[in-house]
Amino acid sequence: MNKIYKILILVILFSCNSKNILTDTGEDSGGGFTGEVGYIQDLNVELISVYDSQTASFSAPFGNFVRNFIVHVPPDYNSENQSLPLVFVLHGYTSQAPIIRQYSGFDQISNEENFIVVYVQGTTDIYGNTGWNAGSFGAFTTVDDVGFFRSLIKYFKTVYNINEKKIFSTGMSMGGFMSYRLACEVDDINSIGSVTGSMGRYTPCQPQTKKSIIHFHGEEDTIVPYNGGDWLYSANEAHEFWKNYNECGNQVSITLPDLNGDGQYTKKLTSYNCEDSKIVELYSLEGEGHTWYSKNWGHDVSSSELIWKFFEDQQ
């Protein structure tokens, strides 16, 4: 199958709830999404650009903002006979969706493990910095990010063939905070992963369903302190919250091998025997700061691979 034909198929796969599809060149190609449009009538998605035969970017007006996201599907994705997991990946404060796409490596994991990954772009504050209404940051309180993700999930359920029991979110820093908020407020989210992001003390969290949580945090993080503060939970407090909420019966802590030989270790705390087969994990990285952890960059663990393995194991 030649590349042009693959791209043509991609455009069809990435069709949207509007009367026109915008192609890579911006030309009007006609057509449009022909399925159950009523389910996505609150989110009018337009194709912006086709990157390659597996990846494209989209925009959708929502509230007072135009929202953007990048979708990557695995090779040979066929919506007619494949029901795949869906993973949202959220950037940190001041960052961008293309940046976390580059450093997290989820495209490659998606190709190998067969799931759909979506890199969502936050909105901007008055200083032009991107971020999320994670409930703890005043600059974004007017943005209905929770509502947007609910609509985005509805869109993917309708346009793509999604395994509705396997919808996940992960993020870096403020993207981790936002993933925690989605765990608290969006029932469709099965589990979340956070890298250097925690929970706000003054953000209500009353989930209606049990959620599995995996959290990575450097003990020397000076941006989002490992030990928390007046307005945010420590990494251990966030773990304790979900351990209690999930009614976990057992807990074990192990020290992982010092793979890079720097004399500093990663401790893995696991709460298990929880209700609904949920699990809560905390990786505490001795001597590490505010970053996305990867063995390729000299860390003892690789966040992305462990997050996906954790998601894959969830029921």
List where the protein language model places each region.
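Short beta-strand/loop motif that positions the catalytic acidic residue
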Residues: 215-217, 221
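Sec-dependent signal peptide recognition
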Residues: 2-10
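Conserved alpha/beta-hydrolase "acid-adjacent" motif
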Residues: 222-234
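Acidic, glycine-rich loop-and-strand cores that form catalytic or ligand-binding grooves
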Residues: 231-263
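Serine-hydrolase catalytic machinery in alpha/beta-hydrolase-like enzymes
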Residues: 65-73, 77, 82-168, 178-181, ...
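Catalytic active-site module of serine/aspartate enzymes centered on a nucleophile-bearing elbow/loop
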Residues: 299-315
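A domain-start/cap signature at the N-terminus of enzymes
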Residues: 16-86, 112, 141, 170-193, ...
